Amino acid sequence: MRRLTLLVLLAAALALGGRARAELAVGTTLDRSNADQAKDLLPPEILSHYQKGEYTNKIVDFPNSAFQWDDGYAEASAQNAKNLTLDATKQPVDRATNKRPDYIMGHPFPEIREDDPDAAVKVLWNTIYTVYTGGNSRNVTVLDWVSPTRIEREAGQDVTFLYYDGQPKHYSPTSNPEDLLFQFIALTLSPADLQGTAALSWRYKDPAKRDANWAYVPSLRRVRAVSPANRSDGFLGSDLSQDDGNFFDGKPEDFTWRLIGRRDALRMTDPDALAGKVVRRPLPGGGWRTPFSNNDRTFGAQVKDWKGVAWAPVAGALTKRKVWVLEGVPKDHYYLYGKIELWVDDYTYTGAWNRKFSWQGDLLNTYQVTGPPSAPYNATERWLGSTFGYQTAENVKASRATVAGPSMPGDVPDDRRIPLAPSFFDYQTLNRFGK
């Protein structure tokens, strides 16, 4: 009799376990009713949004086959596994010469082992080069300052990146006298009191050379150099920083990294992109534009009668992926954050969650990033393709967020692999953007 009772209890437990798993199966929705089933799959502060009914998202399947790279990328990654290593500064270098290559295509470190003491920084370099692979870009986008109930303020931004490495080589400048990785400029288009404000950055390959940063403020009518530590500060007073970028845009060598582990996780993705609804349009001067069909329903404040927090992702869905979890501590003690925790997809190497802590260990900010599948540009080139842009920096202490990614109204640039001239990024002429 006792044996029979134990068997019945075991069967009941298995049935309950099976039902719990079914609740998080593809096609179901994660919300208040079943959020506890995701407690080991999400950062606690994100899980809390689902438990409170502030976030609600469908769960979708994201097979590895949904993400493909350019022709030749896999072969280049395989060669990197043979030829690249890290030097003492943790930059990628050629094994034979101990010098950084002029050009790297593919994942610098395609073979990651958990027992490798350098695993974390190798994962990060793969993540960074995944961004570089996307190529030169220009995006006219909106930053939204959002309270739990509404949009408080907006700023239009015209953001341009030029990459000297990582992207297909014919898109990069033919010469690189400053030995740069990339150049970046952000021009504020609106509101009127900020119009003409510009921020410019140069990232050098030399691990000992800090980023060069300049800012132009029209009311001051001059260009001034800015400390690299300021890249962690809120951009235009928002909760988003320059070091956030696509996911993490800090210089890897400026941090000390360790691997926390590899785990299952839920991350945000684009269900319509997975369904093949991405639109690519070739541009007359070269490159491609990807208009956002879900631009007007990206986050809660845009949707009539939305019941969750105003910055909640609406067009996005959740998908279960394997992720690497990394921890970085800045070497510069003037850096705003004392620790950064990054969750990175272990196949696509796109970022999912970027958690930032104070020097005392308190969680301050969580950067929530969408990881869509790839979509083709042409028969041989492909990269991330989406129907909306959603990157949200949530200030968990102040209960507010900054949403980045939605495009400004009209047929505005959301462009990649476009031709760009290095002269566009000259700090001596930054004041040309002044109103």
Regions found by a protein language model. Give the residues of each.
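Non-transmembrane domains of secretory- and envelope-associated proteins
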Residues: 22-111, 231-313, 320-322, 358-435
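Sec/Tat signal peptide C-region and signal peptidase I cleavage site
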Residues: 16-22
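Bacterial N-terminal signal peptides
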Residues: 7-15
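Solvent-exposed N-terminal domain segments of exported/luminal and surface proteins
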Residues: 23-211, 217
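Short, hydrophobic/aromatic-rich segments at coil-to-beta transitions
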Residues: 179-185, 211, 319-327, 350-354
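Bacterial N-terminal signal peptides that target proteins for export
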Residues: 1-7
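Feature captures eukaryotic membrane-trafficking machinery centered on endolysosomal pathways
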Residues: 324-358
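Short, surface-exposed coil-to-beta transition loops
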Residues: 195-198, 209-210, 335-340, 352, ...
